[in-house]
A protein has these predicted regions:
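Active-site neighborhood of glycoside hydrolase catalytic domains
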Residues: 1-27, 59-60
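Non-catalytic C-terminal accessory modules of carbohydrate-active enzymes
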Residues: 109-250
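Active-site core of glycosidic bond-cleaving carbohydrate-active enzymes
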Residues: 29-165
Length: 251
């Protein structure tokens, strides 16, 4: 069938990519993904992160993703924003958020530093240029009001509250403890997911924090994991719609 043929081609292509990356590892002496097999590492490697976000072809902790991210953060950043010196020559909010998505998925708390950096770069109307001049903080390339950047911001906020990982829904993995310490109720949704729309609330309650959700599932309810940063992960029991996680306010 045509579907089986597509699957075969995808497997063969993935095998070619893996072989190429093995050769790159031997050449560079590190598990990194440059923009091309014979290219040095530079800011163009940002495109290789698509294997983790948004495609999720590579696992969350694949060293090829994480070492590439570390390279970009150490060598291609300005005031915690991703600085793209290939053509763009500016800080890229939407690509900074791509890195943040990789870190969020891997459970790396640095994701929030990047979110804050992008928030600080927003215009008074809540918009971002496609590339931002490092001195003036105004636009220096591309769209003045970059819709892609706005979309990535929405997706970042969405994934902080709810994101898919295989056959699971991960809730609250991007809700930092500083937000919980404000002792204010938070809510998000109804947010679209591959399992159906879901509405989420987060409520601090003394020494605990309560995560609750309601979903309009397309089929049966998926496996749900509540995973606040720095707190124990909790696998929800089916059909409960609520998880209580112990939270020490002094933490």
């Amino acid at each position: 069938t045509r579907g089986a043929d597509f699957d075969r081609q995808a497997r063969e292509y993935r095998e070619c990519v893996d072989r190429s990356l093995s050769h790159v590892e031997g050449r560079l002496g590190a598990k990194m993904m440059p923009a091309a097999p014979y290219r040095r590492m530079d800011s163009g490697a940002i495109g290789s992160l698509a294997a983790g976000y948004p495609l999720q072809i590579f696992s969350a902790n694949d060293p090829r993703l994480l070492e590439t991210v570390n390279y970009l953060l150490e060598n291609c950043s300005f005031e915690k924003g991703f600085f793209h010196d290939m053509t763009h020559s500016g800080i890229n909010p939407y690509l900074t958020l791509h890195i943040a998505q990789i870190l969020l998925r891997a459970g790396d708390p640095r994701y929030f530093d990047l979110i804050n950096a992008v928030a600080q770069l927003a215009s008074p109307t809540g918009q971002w240029p496609e590339a931002i001049h490092p001195r003036t903080k105004g636009g220096c390339m591309g769209d003045g009001q970059h819709v892609w950047a706005a979309a990535e911001w929405f997706l970042m906020m969405r994934n902080c509250f709810v994101r898919e990982e295989g056959d699971r829904l991960i809730l609250c993995s991007g809700i930092p403890l500083r937000w919980i310490k404000r002792n204010e109720k938070m809510s998000f949704g109804p947010a679209p997911t591959i399992f159906g729309p879901v509405y989420i609330t987060v409520k601090p309650d003394g020494r605990n924090v309560i995560a609750a959700w309601t979903g309009q599932w397309f089929d049966k309810e998926p496996s749900i994991e509540v995973s606040f940063p720095g707190l124990p992960k909790v696998r929800a029991r089916p059909q409960t719609g609520c998880v209580v996680v112990e939270f020490e306010r002094r933490a």
